[in-house]
Regions:
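Short, basic/aromatic beta-hairpin or loop at an interaction surface
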Residues: 155-164
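Bacterial N-terminal signal peptides that target proteins for export
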Residues: 1-9
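N-terminal targeting pre-sequences for secretion and organelle import
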Residues: 166, 171-190
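Bacterial N-terminal signal peptides
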Residues: 8-18
């Protein structure tokens, strides 16, 4: 695809699809304290890259953790050494997000004969964010934002197939996104 064609495609997409909101559709749970635990400190997430799972816990007043749910997630392909591990937190929660493919993602798609635009709108079959996006404070070695997001293709969930992010079934991810507030602790294990 030529540069002129790409520019024309981008302009066409801007006409056909509304531009994303400047701040995204972020949520923040402002509910009052529950059982003496502030909302941002109420939940704890642990993600296992090798175990392809995400576990949600509720923190108890005594400092313990009560397991609530474990979800399968798609994680980074074996040998891909760009993902961060360790503690962090949720920095944003978005519904029906746009996808801004990284240069690496665009390269992979180009190798498959698909020229991705710089921004892929919600609902588009090539939007790999699915129905939700949860941004994390974790960053890759190159400074890219790390995310938990939906998967429009369910075969990606529960396997080591992503370019680094965590892919969940859309319905399960929406459940998670509606449960946790921004500020929730997240620990990523290898």
């Amino acid at each position: 695809m030529t540069m002129t064609s790409l520019v024309n495609l981008s302009l066409l997409m801007l006409l056909l699809f509304p531009s994303p909101p400047a701040s995204g559709q972020q949520t923040g749970n402002t509910a009052e304290k529950v059982r003496g635990v502030p909302p941002a400190n109420r939940y704890y997430i642990e993600i296992s890259i090798s175990g392809t799972s995400l576990s949600l816990y509720e923190k108890a007043a005594d400092g313990g953790r009560v397991p609530l749910r474990t979800y399968p997630v798609g994680t980074a392909v074996r040998g891909l050494d760009v993902y961060p591990t360790g503690p962090g937190k949720v920095t944003g929660i978005y519904f029906d997000p746009w996808w801004y493919p990284t240069p690496y993602s665009r390269k992979i798609f180009r190798e498959r004969g698909i020229d991705l635009p710089g921004a892929v709108p919600p609902g588009h079959p090539l939007n790999y964010m699915g129905k939700f996006k949860i941004t994390l404070s974790h960053k890759t070695r190159k400074g890219a934002i790390y995310r938990i997001h939906g998967a429009n293709y369910s075969w990606r969930v529960g396997k080591r197939v992503t370019g680094g992010c965590f892919a969940m079934h859309n319905d399960q991810g929406l459940e998670l996104a509606r449960t946790i507030p921004v500020g929730t602790e997240v620990n990523i294990l290898p």
